Amino acid sequence: MTLALCHIPPASLTELLPKELSHHLCIADVIIRTDNADYARFYRRQSQAGKFVILDSAAFEGECTSPQILSAAARIVRPAEVVLSDDPTSATRTLTMSQECARIMRERGYAGRFMGVPHGKKLREYTQNAADLLEACGVSTFGVVEEIPETLGIPRAEAVSVLRSLFPAIDIHLLGVSEDLNELTDPYLLQQARSCDTAKLIVWGLQKTLVAPGDVPPYPGREALGGRMQYFEYVTTDVFAWDAAIANIETWERVLCAVSSGAS
């Protein structure tokens, strides 16, 4: 297994993503906006073409996405997997929110896979939350957040290793990558995680910045393009900026293949 990258573009630039990408992640709040019909159509077509499309909330973007919004977006996109609601500050609240989200989505006809996002202040609480999500919600995937080193005090790869040992049949998805992109050159993570989402390579590219292993510049953040949510509304006709974004994507797709091949 080689990790698949889900690149997150602004709504206006989805059609320029490389056609060979096998996995995608889209945001429910952007899907249901009537002014983003092209964004919704793009991800619906990816689902119809057999690509693995993950539907996520806009929690990272600072929005409070309801299960009703997730359900409405799921009816449009027909994703392979939906990320259940969570609360990064509370394992108990995460379980309650995920159960409610899963219940509402099933009642509204969603029959696909769920991704649960475990949380905890200690490793034991974290793994118990993962076990509870598996039992209560029937999740097929665990989403491992980028902030693991800050919340648990261990490397992200260690959290993945623990989940792998306890739940070998459950897929792992990395929610975001760190600003130094170290996850994308870690042979263990590339072999053990199914997929990973990030907007970083595109954000750098739209700033006309090329990024390669050993040459990772400071990350400007989505704020450079308007903000976390405003990023999806970003529009540019600068072909040099998009060429740089595509170059970053292609560079790191080659890196993933090379590192994974060397580890196998």
Tell where the protein language model's regions lie, with residue ranges.
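Eukaryote-skewed repeat-based solenoidal scaffolds used as protein-protein interaction platforms
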Residues: A73-G205
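Non-catalytic, usually N-terminal nucleic-acid engagement modules in DNA/RNA processing proteins
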Residues: M1-R106, D243, W252-S264
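Phenylalanine-focused residue identity feature
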Residues: F42-Y43, F52, F60, F114, ...
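Alpha/beta catalytic cores of nucleotide-metabolism and tRNA/nucleoside-modifying enzymes
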Residues: M1-E15, L70-S71, Y110, E135, ...
